[in-house]
Amino acid sequence: MLKITIITLGNKMPDWVNSGVNEYAKRFHDGIQIKLIEIPLLRRNKSSDLARILEKESALIKDALPANARLIALDMLGKSFSSEELALKLTQLQQISSHLCFIIGGPEGLSNEILSLCDERWSLSKLTLPHPLVRIILLESLYRAWSIINNHPYHK
């Protein structure tokens, strides 16, 4: 069984975000387990020490990292994939690890410390995306790749 953990920073999401995440998570067959870990976003204001906030959030992310998982940071400077390339990449990753962990940062992204812990950096887009939407786009992209691998009609 392939486990996919998504660690994300954020506070209570709107219902449409939760609905989108749940919709794609339930589409995967029994051989894939999806787990979402939501770490509360620390409060920010105009006088916030953003470096200190990033450091604290990094510690929370590190505490949530699953053991023996392949760590993949979502980062604007990461590698991007077409749907077909992502399907091939997932096939390759399943031969390396039975547990993939995707990490989505907060408004300032991920710290260098977290990025250095990751095995890979992926980008979903060159655009800056709202972090709640990234959850849905990631799951849809993974589901589309899964459908390509399994010749499921979703991708057609």
Curated annotation (Swiss-Prot):
Pfam families, alphabetized: SPOUT_MTase (PF02590)
Keywords associated with the record: Cytoplasm, Methyltransferase, rRNA processing, S-adenosyl-L-methionine, Transferase
From the UniProt record, list the reaction(s) this protein catalyses.
Answer: pseudouridine(1915) in 23S rRNA + S-adenosyl-L-methionine = N(3)-methylpseudouridine(1915) in 23S rRNA + S-adenosyl-L-homocysteine + H(+)
Task: Supply the SUPFAM superfamilies for this chain.
Answer: alpha/beta knot (SSF75217)
Name the EC number(s).
2.1.1.177
* One cellular component (GO) term of this entry: cytoplasm
Q: Which residues form the signal peptide?
A: none
Q: What class of enzyme is it?
A: transferase
HAMAP family in the cross-refs: 23SrRNA_methyltr_H
Annotated PANTHER family: METHYLTRANSFERASE, RIBOSOMAL RNA LARGE SUBUNIT METHYLTRANSFERASE H
Instruction: Tell me the function of this protein.
Output: Specifically methylates the pseudouridine at position 1915 (m3Psi1915) in 23S rRNA.
Q: Which protein family is it in?
A: Belongs to the RNA methyltransferase RlmH family.
Specify the protein name: Ribosomal RNA large subunit methyltransferase H
Please tell me the species this chain comes from: Legionella pneumophila (strain Corby)
